[in-house]
Amino acid sequence: MVRVRAVVMARDDSSGGWLPVGGGGLSQVSVCRVRGARPEGGARQGHYVIHGERLRDQKTTLECTLRPGLVYNKVNPIFHHWSLGDCKFGLTFQSPAEADEFQKSLLAALAALSRGSLTPSSSSSSSSPSQDTAETPCPLTSHVDSDSSSSHSRQETPPTAPIATVESAAAFPLATRPQRRRSSAQSYPPLLPFTGIPEPSESLAGAGSQGWGSRGYEDYRRSGPPPPPLALSTCVVRFAKTGALRGAALGPPVSLPAPLTEAAPPAPPARPPPGPGPTPAPAKASPEAEEAARCVHCRALFRRRADGRGGRCAEAPDPGRLLVRRLSCLWCAESLLYHCLSDAEGDFSDPCACEPGHPRPAARWAALAALSLAVPCLCCYAPLRACHWVAARCGCAGCGGRHEEAAR
């Protein structure tokens, strides 16, 4: 359903905060549907899972089976977390757009899961009312989609069903919710709005427009789409192939037919060339027959070659550079800079970087010089790094990370 890149977080009850799972690192997190019965053995349509796999070593960092009663919290545009029973998971996204896309897919999966779990309970409601109330799932509640979740609970759950809420929903009076639920049950037939296509994204957008705490986030996410229709409406596609861009941009619309009449005579010579085979071949063939693809390491677009690889990638694994770092014992210099010359956040510059702006450059180079006396192999880093650079420029195998196309 969706695939994003984020850092998987876990709740630390001892400190009361969130910590990265497995030492951190970006993971490929996806919401997907698994065919077959759920582990509980309830629904027949299949179940939905949230699966996370770290890009660095393909290690599974997140495995969560979705069930009704999930409580979703949106702390800020790029950090969301949810709880399911005693389990708590969190994700730190790279952009608000990816976070919004993940939340919409999660809402869609839970809406489909709720409809699937309500089907058997509605058929057995006439025989055993107690089973109907026991099988009724708790709807999803979140900071952003509180209105849509309340309308979802009004139409699918009885007035006495428990509703999972979050701390931000305390601003609403609790006494008015059963009354609104009864009135909606009397005026609208149950389950009718949910018999068609799932509409979690539309309800989310509607809740954002009426939002009680997410109006800023909704305006931020929806601020981009309006410009593309304006740009498409102002361009004239009819004159793009005739080369009359100057007349379309500067001249009035009345003067545009003149270039068309002048361009009409060259049109007949263009028709005969498609008949012979040799002429259209140079026009259709691109210089290197390359296609645009997305890199699996940095998620950037690149021109894919015949071997499926592209240019240099800073985040791609580089065995040659790793060998240079190990042979020169560069980790000793990094450890020295981290423990002695790092800032308040624990960041430090590269040991061999000559970039200006360091607060204590003299102390930094003096410490590295003293360390090189104790670890002489540090002096080999410069020539080894130069050899690696030459090998990467020559295209030697194992030297220099390259863009690789993501698996489809």
Swiss-Prot record:
**Which UniProt keywords are listed?**
Cell membrane, Lipoprotein, Membrane, Methylation, Palmitate, Phosphoprotein, Ubl conjugation
Name the Gene Ontology biological process terms. negative regulation of epithelial to mesenchymal transition; negative regulation of ERK1 and ERK2 cascade; negative regulation of lens fiber cell differentiation; negative regulation of MAPK cascade; negative regulation of transforming growth factor beta receptor signaling pathway
Q: How does it sit in the membrane?
A: Peripheral membrane protein
Pfam families, per this entry? Sprouty (PF05210), WH1 (PF00568)
Q: In what way is this protein post-translationally modified?
A: Phosphorylated on tyrosine. Palmitoylated by ZDHHC17/HIP14.
Identify residues that carry Asymmetric dimethylarginine.
Answer: 238
Tissues and organs where the protein is expressed, per its UniProt entry: Brain specific.
**Where this protein primarily resides, as one coarse class?**
membrane
KBD domain mapped to chain residues: 192-242
Origin superkingdom: Eukaryota
Kindly provide the name given to this protein in its UniProt entry: Sprouty-related, EVH1 domain-containing protein 3
Which lineage is the organism of this entry classified under, starting from the top rank? Eukaryota, Metazoa, Chordata, Craniata, Vertebrata
